[in-house]
A protein has these predicted regions:
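Alpha-helix boundary recognition
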Residues: 10-11, 57-58, 99
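Extreme N-terminal tail/first-helix region
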Residues: 1-17, 142-147
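Charged, gly/pro-rich active-site loop segments
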Residues: 75-147
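Short, surface-exposed beta-strand-loop junctions and turns on beta-sheet-rich folds
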Residues: 50-52, 71, 132-134
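A short, aromatic/hydrophobic, helix- or strand-capping loop or linear motif
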Residues: 21-22, 66-69, 104-112
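Short beta-strand segments
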Residues: 13-48, 56, 62-67, 75-79
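A generic "binding-loop/recognition-motif" signal
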Residues: 48-49, 122
Length: 147
């Protein structure tokens, strides 16, 4: 699998299931619209007072499942990373990544409390269950940089 192959699969899916944990360690999940940077960063927007934003400010560890939620999709990416809330030039860069997938995101910029979250990957598992045996590949952050 090449870098382009993995990015192409991840970018084909505009939505993912995002998970975080609350301050009391309760698991919480949400479907979010995602954009994927060339460095495998995920970007999504949310409101600052949403459960996910509050959780990620307290504990930036986050996980996603991309793909595999439709009957015709037999491939998935499991993604673990660290979230942050960029500002300044970095915020503008990640916003442009997000707007390339969700142009209507610009219309939400005036929403009170809107934030953009960037997630840097620590670990990705790509699984394709179509071939037998299934193809399962794992990449840590160092391997992703070399891919």
């Amino acid at each position: 699998m090449t870098r382009t192959d993995l990015l192409t699969f991840m970018r084909a899916e505009k939505f993912a299931v995002q998970t975080s944990v609350s301050r009391t360690y309760a698991p919480q999940a949400a479907v979010v619209g995602i954009a994927v940077s060339d460095d495998f960063e995920l970007v999504f927007d949310t409101l600052a007072d949403s459960r996910k934003a509050v959780n990620l400010r307290a504990n930036p560890s986050v996980a996603f499942v991309i793909g595999g939620i439709r009957d015709d999709v037999v491939r998935t990416v499991q993604y673990e990373g660290v979230a942050d809330f960029p500002f300044g030039d970095e915020l503008r860069r990640v916003q442009e990544t997000y707007f390339s997938v969700f142009p209507d995101g610009r219309d939400r910029l005036h929403w009170k409390g809107l934030v953009h979250v960037r997630v840097k990957p620590l670990w990705i598992r790509y699984s394709n269950y179509e071939p037998q045996p299934p193809l399962v590949l794992e990449f840590d952050a160092a391997a992703l940089r070399l891919l």
